[in-house]
């Protein structure tokens, strides 16, 4: 279906607006994946706070101009599915990584985070980022361990001082 100029402008405006508010982006090639599987992916994306869209490469190049995802321009070759993580930087990467494991024909092309291009081979860097809750839990456990260790050392020093006296 041919798009008229107004439709193209609307697509560019929508994708550009989403890109400005996104934390990260992942680009993939979904050739050979069934419609049912893509529907499952889109549903999982909505639940994870990921905006997904298949967009023409020329329109996508225009949409990412002036955003942190401009570094992805070289990845816009062939059929392009772009996903923006809106709530957590690793959400789209994690979603695509899991989907690619189950679907051999689904290929992740590249990702971008804070203006840095992440090649498909290093997508784990983005996919393994802890969520906000996980990061807080790790920080709290580290602080708790440090406090407990300090208490143990203090008690040992008091015990040694009493033994010496």
Swiss-Prot record:
One of its GO terms (molecular function) is structural constituent of ribosome. One of its GO terms (biological process) is translation. Pfam families: Ribosomal_L10 (PF00466). The keyword RNA-binding applies. One of its GO terms (cellular component) is large ribosomal subunit. InterPro entries: Ribosomal_uL10, Ribosomal_uL10-like_sf, Ribosomal_uL10_bac, Ribosomal_uL10_bac_type, Ribosomal_uL10_CS_bac. Disulfide bonds: none annotated. Keywords: Ribonucleoprotein, Ribosomal protein, RNA-binding, rRNA-binding. Part of the ribosomal stalk of the 50S ribosomal subunit. The N-terminus interacts with L11 and the large rRNA to form the base of the stalk. The C-terminus forms an elongated spine to which L12 dimers bind in a sequential fashion forming a multimeric L10(L12)X complex. Forms part of the ribosomal stalk, playing a central role in the interaction of the ribosome with GTP-bound translation factors. PANTHER family: 39S RIBOSOMAL PROTEIN L10, MITOCHONDRIAL. Belongs to the universal ribosomal protein uL10 family. This is Large ribosomal subunit protein uL10. It comes from Cronobacter sakazakii (strain ATCC BAA-894) (Enterobacter sakazakii). The gene is rplJ.
């Amino acid at each position: 279906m041919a798009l008229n100029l107004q439709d193209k402008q609307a697509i560019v405006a929508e994708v550009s607006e989403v890109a400005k508010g996104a934390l990260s982006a992942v680009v993939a090639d979904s050739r050979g994946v069934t419609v049912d599987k893509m529907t499952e992916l889109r549903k999982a994306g909505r639940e994870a706070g990921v905006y997904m869209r298949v967009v023409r490469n020329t329109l996508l190049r225009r949409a990412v101009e002036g955003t942190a995802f401009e570094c992805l321009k070289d990845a816009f070759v062939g059929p392009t599915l772009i996903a923006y993580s809106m709530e957590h930087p690793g959400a789209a990467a994690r979603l695509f990584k899991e989907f690619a494991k189950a679907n051999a024909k689904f290929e992740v092309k590249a990702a971008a985070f804070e203006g840095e291009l992440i090649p498909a081979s290093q997508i784990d860097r983005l996919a393994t980022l802890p969520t906000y809750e996980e990061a807080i839990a790790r920080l709290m456990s580290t602080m708790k361990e440090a406090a407990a260790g300090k208490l143990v050392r203090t008690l040992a020093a008091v015990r040694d001082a009493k033994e010496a006296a």
